[in-house]
Regions:
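Short, non-helical or kinked segments that cap or interrupt transmembrane helices
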Residues: 34-53, 99-112
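Membrane-interface helix caps of multi-pass small-molecule transporters
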Residues: 32, 56, 60, 64, ...
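Alpha-helical transmembrane segments in multi-pass membrane proteins
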Residues: 18, 22-30, 46, 50-54, ...
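Alpha-helical transmembrane segments within multi-pass membrane transporters and channels
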Residues: 67-119
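Alpha-helical transmembrane segments of multi-pass integral membrane proteins
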Residues: 148-180
């Protein structure tokens, strides 16, 4: 009986969608990179850089704003900005090594993956993680009417804004790649 509630569709599908969004964003980026003629095996490392940058940005924003009644939306946008910044820096490292220095794309990509994972592990031990749950609660906020629709509402509308943003990015990338 306990396993029935754990392995129900209403529990598995929303979690699978939220986890799958991470892979969706990485795959969209890799498809665009491959269309340009490069093979970037360092996408997981770039994603680690971005995630670490997002956590660092949220931590810095919480320290700047203070303990009072912070503007959580500002914290999330600060985290997203740092996430994009760190991901762009990792992409610039990859492009400098492969395009400018003509290094092997496979070797550089795998090295970036290993370095990104190690960088994330190192920096996440330094960051004060006690305040990061505030930003994650706002990112995971559901649409208000999702609970009234039952299981269907949880599966389709029970996700944070970044899930829908990622789906929009994937659809936009599909349209751009298909029509150009």
């Amino acid at each position: 009986m306990i396993l029935d509630s754990v392995f129900s569709i209403g529990n598995i599908l929303p979690s699978a969608i939220q986890i799958g969004v991470v892979f969706l964003l990485g795959c969209v980026g890799e498809i665009i990179i491959e269309k340009s003629g490069n093979l970037n095996l360092g996408i997981p490392g770039v994603m680690c850089f971005g995630a670490t940058g997002g956590a660092l940005g949220c931590s810095i924003a919480m320290k700047i704003i203070g303990e009072g009644d912070p503007n959580y939306l500002l914290v999330v946008f600060f985290g997203l900005f740092f996430c994009l910044l760190f991901g762009a820096i990792a992409g610039l490292i990859y492009s400098f090594l492969t395009v400018t220095l003509h290094s092997n794309q496979t070797v550089v990509g795998l090295a970036l993956t290993i370095f990104g994972g190690g960088f994330a592990n190192f920096l996440m031990n330094i960051i004060d993680q006690s305040k990061l749950s505030v930003a994650s609660k706002l990112i995971k906020a559901k649409l208000p009417f999702a609970d009234s629709l039952g299981v269907f509402g949880d599966i389709v509308f029970g996700h944070g804004i970044l899930v829908y943003l990622a789906l929009g990015i994937a659809i936009a990338a599909f349209i751009v790649l298909k029509t150009t």
